[in-house]
Swiss-Prot record:
It is a multi-pass membrane protein. This is Multidrug resistance protein MdtL. It comes from Shewanella oneidensis (strain ATCC 700550 / JCM 31522 / CIP 106686 / LMG 19005 / NCIMB 14063 / MR-1). NCBIfam families: PRK10473.1 (NF007782). GO terms for cellular component: plasma membrane.
Length: 396
Protein backbone atom coordinates (compact mmCIF):
# COMPACT_ATOMS: atom_id res chain seq x y z
CA UNK A 1 0.00 0.00 0.00
CA UNK A 2 2.85 2.40 0.83
CA UNK A 3 4.15 2.25 -2.75
CA UNK A 4 0.83 3.54 -4.12
CA UNK A 5 0.59 6.35 -1.58
CA UNK A 6 4.20 7.42 -2.19
CA UNK A 7 3.77 7.51 -5.97
CA UNK A 8 0.37 9.24 -5.77
CA UNK A 9 1.75 11.96 -3.51
CA UNK A 10 4.64 12.53 -5.91
CA UNK A 11 2.32 12.67 -8.92
CA UNK A 12 -0.04 15.18 -7.29
CA UNK A 13 2.74 17.48 -6.06
CA UNK A 14 4.05 18.14 -9.58
CA UNK A 15 0.99 20.28 -10.36
CA UNK A 16 1.40 22.93 -7.60
CA UNK A 17 5.21 22.87 -7.87
CA UNK A 18 4.95 23.86 -11.53
CA UNK A 19 2.82 26.84 -10.51
CA UNK A 20 4.66 28.19 -7.48
CA UNK A 21 8.39 27.52 -7.82
CA UNK A 22 9.16 29.73 -10.83
CA UNK A 23 7.28 32.84 -9.59
CA UNK A 24 10.21 34.07 -7.51
CA UNK A 25 12.33 34.26 -10.68
CA UNK A 26 9.74 36.05 -12.81
CA UNK A 27 11.53 39.45 -12.89
CA UNK A 28 14.80 37.84 -14.04
CA UNK A 29 12.99 35.66 -16.59
CA UNK A 30 11.22 38.71 -18.03
CA UNK A 31 14.47 40.66 -18.21
CA UNK A 32 16.44 37.92 -19.98
CA UNK A 33 13.67 37.02 -22.44
CA UNK A 34 12.91 40.65 -23.28
CA UNK A 35 9.32 40.55 -22.06
CA UNK A 36 7.40 42.39 -19.37
CA UNK A 37 6.38 40.67 -16.15
CA UNK A 38 2.75 41.28 -17.13
CA UNK A 39 3.31 39.39 -20.41
CA UNK A 40 4.90 36.46 -18.62
CA UNK A 41 2.10 36.26 -16.06
CA UNK A 42 0.17 34.54 -18.85
CA UNK A 43 2.49 31.59 -18.23
CA UNK A 44 0.22 30.73 -15.30
CA UNK A 45 -2.85 30.54 -17.55
CA UNK A 46 -0.92 28.66 -20.24
CA UNK A 47 0.15 26.06 -17.68
CA UNK A 48 -3.47 25.56 -16.54
CA UNK A 49 -4.58 25.41 -20.18
CA UNK A 50 -2.11 22.59 -20.77
CA UNK A 51 -3.52 20.73 -17.79
CA UNK A 52 -7.13 21.22 -18.86
CA UNK A 53 -6.60 20.12 -22.47
CA UNK A 54 -4.87 16.89 -21.48
CA UNK A 55 -7.11 15.81 -18.61
CA UNK A 56 -9.86 14.13 -20.61
CA UNK A 57 -7.68 12.06 -22.92
CA UNK A 58 -5.33 11.17 -20.04
CA UNK A 59 -8.17 9.73 -17.98
CA UNK A 60 -9.65 7.85 -20.92
CA UNK A 61 -6.28 6.37 -21.90
CA UNK A 62 -5.58 5.41 -18.29
CA UNK A 63 -8.82 3.41 -18.29
CA UNK A 64 -7.83 1.66 -21.55
CA UNK A 65 -4.11 0.96 -21.31
CA UNK A 66 -3.52 1.29 -17.57
CA UNK A 67 -2.36 3.87 -15.06
CA UNK A 68 1.39 3.30 -15.17
CA UNK A 69 2.07 4.21 -18.83
CA UNK A 70 0.29 7.55 -18.41
CA UNK A 71 2.22 8.38 -15.25
CA UNK A 72 5.51 7.59 -17.00
CA UNK A 73 4.57 9.74 -19.99
CA UNK A 74 3.39 12.63 -17.82
CA UNK A 75 6.41 12.66 -15.51
CA UNK A 76 8.88 12.40 -18.41
CA UNK A 77 7.12 15.15 -20.37
CA UNK A 78 7.11 17.40 -17.29
CA UNK A 79 10.86 16.84 -16.90
CA UNK A 80 11.63 17.49 -20.58
CA UNK A 81 9.40 20.57 -20.72
CA UNK A 82 11.09 21.95 -17.60
CA UNK A 83 14.50 21.40 -19.22
CA UNK A 84 13.46 23.24 -22.40
CA UNK A 85 11.88 26.06 -20.36
CA UNK A 86 15.26 26.55 -18.67
CA UNK A 87 16.91 26.92 -22.07
CA UNK A 88 14.29 29.20 -23.63
CA UNK A 89 15.65 32.23 -25.49
CA UNK A 90 12.32 33.89 -26.26
CA UNK A 91 9.06 34.36 -24.40
CA UNK A 92 7.19 32.33 -27.04
CA UNK A 93 9.41 29.28 -26.52
CA UNK A 94 9.06 29.72 -22.77
CA UNK A 95 5.25 29.72 -23.01
CA UNK A 96 5.29 26.62 -25.25
CA UNK A 97 7.43 24.84 -22.67
CA UNK A 98 5.02 25.92 -19.92
CA UNK A 99 2.09 24.51 -21.90
CA UNK A 100 3.93 21.19 -22.24
CA UNK A 101 4.68 21.28 -18.52
CA UNK A 102 0.94 21.62 -17.91
CA UNK A 103 0.24 18.60 -20.10
CA UNK A 104 2.68 16.49 -18.10
CA UNK A 105 1.36 17.69 -14.75
CA UNK A 106 -2.24 17.14 -15.89
CA UNK A 107 -1.54 13.52 -16.83
CA UNK A 108 0.03 12.85 -13.44
CA UNK A 109 -2.66 14.68 -11.46
CA UNK A 110 -5.57 12.83 -13.07
CA UNK A 111 -4.02 9.38 -12.82
CA UNK A 112 -3.03 9.90 -9.17
CA UNK A 113 -6.69 10.14 -8.18
CA UNK A 114 -7.56 7.13 -10.35
CA UNK A 115 -4.83 5.08 -8.63
CA UNK A 116 -6.20 5.98 -5.21
CA UNK A 117 -9.67 4.97 -6.41
CA UNK A 118 -8.27 1.62 -7.52
CA UNK A 119 -6.47 0.70 -4.31
CA UNK A 120 -8.50 2.26 -1.49
CA UNK A 121 -12.02 1.67 -0.25
CA UNK A 122 -14.39 4.58 0.30
CA UNK A 123 -13.51 5.39 3.91
CA UNK A 124 -9.73 5.12 3.57
CA UNK A 125 -9.78 7.04 0.29
CA UNK A 126 -11.56 9.98 1.92
CA UNK A 127 -8.86 10.09 4.60
CA UNK A 128 -5.97 9.84 2.14
CA UNK A 129 -7.39 12.49 -0.20
CA UNK A 130 -7.70 14.84 2.77
CA UNK A 131 -4.03 14.23 3.57
CA UNK A 132 -3.08 14.76 -0.09
CA UNK A 133 -4.89 18.09 0.07
CA UNK A 134 -2.95 18.96 3.22
CA UNK A 135 0.39 18.19 1.61
CA UNK A 136 -0.61 20.20 -1.47
CA UNK A 137 -1.23 23.21 0.79
CA UNK A 138 2.43 23.11 1.83
CA UNK A 139 3.74 23.69 -1.70
CA UNK A 140 2.62 27.35 -2.13
CA UNK A 141 4.59 28.13 1.03
CA UNK A 142 7.66 25.93 0.52
CA UNK A 143 8.18 26.21 -3.26
CA UNK A 144 8.83 30.00 -3.34
CA UNK A 145 11.20 29.67 -0.38
CA UNK A 146 13.14 26.89 -2.13
CA UNK A 147 13.14 28.95 -5.30
CA UNK A 148 14.52 31.96 -3.42
CA UNK A 149 17.30 29.87 -1.87
CA UNK A 150 18.22 28.43 -5.27
CA UNK A 151 18.41 31.89 -6.84
CA UNK A 152 20.75 33.14 -4.13
CA UNK A 153 23.46 31.03 -5.80
CA UNK A 154 22.21 30.25 -9.31
CA UNK A 155 20.36 32.00 -12.20
CA UNK A 156 16.67 31.49 -12.98
CA UNK A 157 17.11 28.42 -15.29
CA UNK A 158 18.12 26.47 -12.18
CA UNK A 159 14.49 26.71 -11.01
CA UNK A 160 13.38 24.72 -14.04
CA UNK A 161 16.31 22.32 -13.80
CA UNK A 162 15.09 21.61 -10.27
CA UNK A 163 11.59 20.92 -11.61
CA UNK A 164 13.12 18.69 -14.30
CA UNK A 165 14.93 16.73 -11.59
CA UNK A 166 11.65 16.38 -9.71
CA UNK A 167 9.98 15.05 -12.87
CA UNK A 168 12.75 12.50 -13.35
CA UNK A 169 12.49 11.44 -9.70
CA UNK A 170 8.74 10.85 -10.05
CA UNK A 171 9.40 9.02 -13.34
CA UNK A 172 11.87 6.72 -11.56
CA UNK A 173 9.40 6.14 -8.72
CA UNK A 174 6.64 5.18 -11.12
CA UNK A 175 8.98 3.00 -13.19
CA UNK A 176 10.55 1.09 -10.31
CA UNK A 177 8.03 1.26 -7.47
CA UNK A 178 4.53 1.70 -8.89
CA UNK A 179 2.60 -1.41 -9.88
CA UNK A 180 -0.26 -1.33 -12.34
CA UNK A 181 -3.57 -1.02 -10.49
CA UNK A 182 -5.99 -1.24 -13.40
CA UNK A 183 -4.84 -4.38 -15.24
CA UNK A 184 -7.44 -6.69 -13.74
CA UNK A 185 -10.21 -4.18 -13.22
CA UNK A 186 -12.00 -5.22 -16.40
CA UNK A 187 -12.31 -8.78 -15.12
CA UNK A 188 -14.03 -7.60 -11.97
CA UNK A 189 -16.28 -5.08 -13.66
CA UNK A 190 -17.74 -7.72 -15.97
CA UNK A 191 -19.11 -9.50 -12.91
CA UNK A 192 -20.54 -6.37 -11.35
CA UNK A 193 -24.10 -5.43 -12.36
CA UNK A 194 -23.43 -1.93 -11.06
CA UNK A 195 -20.93 -1.28 -13.86
CA UNK A 196 -23.79 -0.84 -16.30
CA UNK A 197 -24.74 2.17 -14.19
CA UNK A 198 -21.28 3.76 -14.41
CA UNK A 199 -22.79 6.74 -16.18
CA UNK A 200 -21.53 10.27 -15.81
CA UNK A 201 -25.12 11.47 -16.10
CA UNK A 202 -26.15 10.00 -12.75
CA UNK A 203 -27.36 12.58 -10.27
CA UNK A 204 -24.98 11.55 -7.51
CA UNK A 205 -21.83 12.08 -9.59
CA UNK A 206 -23.08 15.38 -11.03
CA UNK A 207 -23.95 16.68 -7.57
CA UNK A 208 -20.48 15.89 -6.20
CA UNK A 209 -18.84 17.30 -9.31
CA UNK A 210 -20.73 20.57 -8.77
CA UNK A 211 -19.83 20.68 -5.06
CA UNK A 212 -16.10 20.08 -5.64
CA UNK A 213 -16.07 22.56 -8.53
CA UNK A 214 -17.67 25.27 -6.40
CA UNK A 215 -15.18 24.50 -3.64
CA UNK A 216 -12.16 24.85 -5.93
CA UNK A 217 -13.63 28.04 -7.43
CA UNK A 218 -14.02 29.42 -3.90
CA UNK A 219 -10.45 28.70 -2.81
CA UNK A 220 -8.94 30.00 -6.07
CA UNK A 221 -11.09 33.14 -5.84
CA UNK A 222 -9.73 33.66 -2.33
CA UNK A 223 -6.15 33.27 -3.60
CA UNK A 224 -6.85 35.63 -6.50
CA UNK A 225 -8.39 38.47 -4.45
CA UNK A 226 -6.26 38.06 -1.32
CA UNK A 227 -3.63 40.67 -2.37
CA UNK A 228 -6.34 43.32 -2.87
CA UNK A 229 -8.02 42.52 0.44
CA UNK A 230 -4.93 42.03 2.59
CA UNK A 231 -2.59 44.68 1.15
CA UNK A 232 -5.22 47.04 -0.27
CA UNK A 233 -8.09 47.02 2.20
CA UNK A 234 -6.23 45.96 5.35
CA UNK A 235 -3.06 47.94 4.61
CA UNK A 236 -0.54 45.10 5.04
CA UNK A 237 2.85 45.34 3.33
CA UNK A 238 4.31 42.52 1.21
CA UNK A 239 6.08 40.89 4.11
CA UNK A 240 2.91 40.89 6.21
CA UNK A 241 0.97 39.56 3.23
CA UNK A 242 3.41 36.67 2.83
CA UNK A 243 3.18 35.89 6.53
CA UNK A 244 -0.62 35.96 6.38
CA UNK A 245 -0.73 33.57 3.42
CA UNK A 246 1.72 31.25 5.18
CA UNK A 247 -0.48 31.30 8.27
CA UNK A 248 -3.56 30.44 6.20
CA UNK A 249 -1.64 27.61 4.52
CA UNK A 250 -0.91 26.30 8.02
CA UNK A 251 -4.63 26.48 8.83
CA UNK A 252 -5.37 24.49 5.67
CA UNK A 253 -2.77 21.87 6.58
CA UNK A 254 -4.09 21.45 10.11
CA UNK A 255 -7.66 21.13 8.86
CA UNK A 256 -6.66 18.61 6.18
CA UNK A 257 -4.63 16.43 8.54
CA UNK A 258 -7.43 16.59 11.14
CA UNK A 259 -10.04 15.31 8.69
CA UNK A 260 -8.97 11.61 8.84
CA UNK A 261 -9.50 11.69 12.60
CA UNK A 262 -12.84 13.47 12.23
CA UNK A 263 -13.96 10.75 9.81
CA UNK A 264 -13.54 8.21 12.60
CA UNK A 265 -16.21 10.03 14.62
CA UNK A 266 -18.49 11.73 12.11
CA UNK A 267 -20.22 10.74 8.88
CA UNK A 268 -18.92 12.04 5.56
CA UNK A 269 -22.17 13.91 4.97
CA UNK A 270 -21.82 15.70 8.30
CA UNK A 271 -18.28 16.85 7.48
CA UNK A 272 -19.26 18.12 4.04
CA UNK A 273 -22.19 20.07 5.50
CA UNK A 274 -19.90 21.42 8.23
CA UNK A 275 -17.42 22.60 5.59
CA UNK A 276 -20.21 24.47 3.80
CA UNK A 277 -21.23 25.96 7.13
CA UNK A 278 -17.71 27.36 7.45
CA UNK A 279 -18.12 29.01 4.04
CA UNK A 280 -21.36 30.61 5.25
CA UNK A 281 -19.58 31.79 8.42
CA UNK A 282 -16.81 33.30 6.28
CA UNK A 283 -19.37 35.18 4.17
CA UNK A 284 -20.99 36.58 7.33
CA UNK A 285 -17.61 37.76 8.64
CA UNK A 286 -16.87 39.58 5.37
CA UNK A 287 -20.32 41.19 5.37
CA UNK A 288 -19.78 42.46 8.92
CA UNK A 289 -16.39 43.94 8.07
CA UNK A 290 -17.80 45.69 4.99
CA UNK A 291 -20.71 47.15 6.97
CA UNK A 292 -18.28 48.49 9.55
CA UNK A 293 -19.60 46.34 12.35
CA UNK A 294 -16.13 44.98 13.10
CA UNK A 295 -12.56 45.86 12.17
CA UNK A 296 -11.12 44.79 8.81
CA UNK A 297 -8.69 42.68 10.83
CA UNK A 298 -11.56 40.23 11.29
CA UNK A 299 -11.14 39.38 7.60
CA UNK A 300 -8.38 37.08 8.82
CA UNK A 301 -11.01 35.01 10.63
CA UNK A 302 -13.00 34.83 7.41
CA UNK A 303 -9.92 33.68 5.49
CA UNK A 304 -9.35 30.96 8.10
CA UNK A 305 -12.96 29.79 7.68
CA UNK A 306 -12.51 29.65 3.88
CA UNK A 307 -9.27 27.64 4.09
CA UNK A 308 -10.50 25.20 6.73
CA UNK A 309 -13.88 24.75 5.02
CA UNK A 310 -12.23 23.80 1.74
CA UNK A 311 -9.67 21.53 3.40
CA UNK A 312 -12.26 19.60 5.41
CA UNK A 313 -14.78 19.14 2.61
CA UNK A 314 -12.77 18.74 -0.60
CA UNK A 315 -11.10 15.37 -0.03
CA UNK A 316 -14.27 13.77 1.32
CA UNK A 317 -16.40 15.05 -1.57
CA UNK A 318 -13.81 14.00 -4.18
CA UNK A 319 -13.80 10.52 -2.68
CA UNK A 320 -17.58 10.32 -2.95
CA UNK A 321 -17.48 11.57 -6.55
CA UNK A 322 -15.10 8.75 -7.55
CA UNK A 323 -16.91 6.05 -5.58
CA UNK A 324 -19.41 4.89 -8.26
CA UNK A 325 -16.66 4.13 -10.80
CA UNK A 326 -14.46 1.07 -11.20
CA UNK A 327 -13.93 0.72 -14.95
CA UNK A 328 -14.15 4.47 -15.67
CA UNK A 329 -12.34 5.98 -12.68
CA UNK A 330 -9.78 7.66 -14.94
CA UNK A 331 -12.36 9.51 -17.01
CA UNK A 332 -14.28 10.43 -13.86
CA UNK A 333 -11.11 11.95 -12.40
CA UNK A 334 -10.55 13.82 -15.67
CA UNK A 335 -14.05 15.28 -15.70
CA UNK A 336 -13.67 16.46 -12.12
CA UNK A 337 -10.35 18.15 -12.89
CA UNK A 338 -11.58 19.81 -16.08
CA UNK A 339 -14.73 21.14 -14.40
CA UNK A 340 -12.74 22.53 -11.48
CA UNK A 341 -10.03 24.23 -13.55
CA UNK A 342 -12.28 25.62 -16.28
CA UNK A 343 -15.08 26.84 -13.99
CA UNK A 344 -12.62 28.58 -11.68
CA UNK A 345 -10.86 30.32 -14.57
CA UNK A 346 -14.17 31.31 -16.19
CA UNK A 347 -15.63 32.70 -12.96
CA UNK A 348 -12.57 34.82 -12.15
CA UNK A 349 -12.35 36.03 -15.77
CA UNK A 350 -16.04 37.03 -15.95
CA UNK A 351 -15.88 38.80 -12.59
CA UNK A 352 -12.87 40.73 -13.87
CA UNK A 353 -14.67 41.73 -17.07
CA UNK A 354 -17.65 42.95 -15.04
CA UNK A 355 -15.25 44.86 -12.76
CA UNK A 356 -16.72 43.29 -9.64
CA UNK A 357 -14.87 44.32 -6.48
CA UNK A 358 -12.50 41.84 -4.83
CA UNK A 359 -14.64 41.33 -1.73
CA UNK A 360 -17.81 40.83 -3.79
CA UNK A 361 -16.09 38.21 -5.97
CA UNK A 362 -15.40 36.21 -2.83
CA UNK A 363 -18.77 36.91 -1.19
CA UNK A 364 -20.70 35.81 -4.29
CA UNK A 365 -19.01 32.43 -4.68
CA UNK A 366 -19.10 31.78 -0.92
CA UNK A 367 -22.83 32.49 -0.68
CA UNK A 368 -24.02 30.88 -3.90
CA UNK A 369 -21.60 27.96 -3.61
CA UNK A 370 -22.61 27.12 -0.04
CA UNK A 371 -26.33 27.41 -0.83
CA UNK A 372 -26.09 25.17 -3.91
CA UNK A 373 -23.81 22.65 -2.18
CA UNK A 374 -25.98 22.31 0.93
CA UNK A 375 -29.06 21.88 -1.25
CA UNK A 376 -27.37 19.16 -3.31
CA UNK A 377 -26.10 17.34 -0.21
CA UNK A 378 -29.60 17.21 1.25
CA UNK A 379 -31.34 16.42 -2.05
CA UNK A 380 -28.89 13.81 -3.41
CA UNK A 381 -27.73 11.53 -0.58
CA UNK A 382 -25.11 8.85 -1.02
CA UNK A 383 -26.41 5.96 -3.11
CA UNK A 384 -26.89 2.65 -1.35
CA UNK A 385 -26.03 0.71 -4.49
CA UNK A 386 -22.64 2.36 -4.55
CA UNK A 387 -21.51 -0.32 -2.12
CA UNK A 388 -21.54 -2.73 -5.09
CA UNK A 389 -19.09 -0.62 -7.02
CA UNK A 390 -16.84 -0.02 -4.03
CA UNK A 391 -14.76 -3.10 -4.84
CA UNK A 392 -11.16 -2.63 -5.89
CA UNK A 393 -9.10 -4.52 -8.47
CA UNK A 394 -7.16 -7.63 -7.40
CA UNK A 395 -4.01 -6.13 -8.88
CA UNK A 396 -4.09 -3.51 -6.13
Amino acid sequence: MFRYLLCSFGLVLMYPTGIDMYLVGLPQIASQLGASEAQLHIAFSVYLAGMATTMLFAGSLADRIGRKPITLFGALLFALASYFAAGSQTSDLFLIARFAQGIGAGCCYVVAFAILRDVLDDKRRAKVLSMVNGVTCIIPVIAPVIGHLIMLKFPWPSLFYTMAAMGLLVFALCLLVLRETHSKAAFHTQALPGVQRESFKQGFFISRLVITTLGVTTILSYVNVSPMLIMGQMGFDRGQYSNTMAMMALVSMLASFSTPFLLNRFKEKSLILFSQGLFVAAALVFILTQLGGVSHSFNLLGFAFVCSGFSIGFGVTMSQALSPFVARAGVASSLLGIAQVCTSALYIWVMGLLEVSAINILLLILSVGALVSITLMLAVPKMSEMVVNEQIPESA
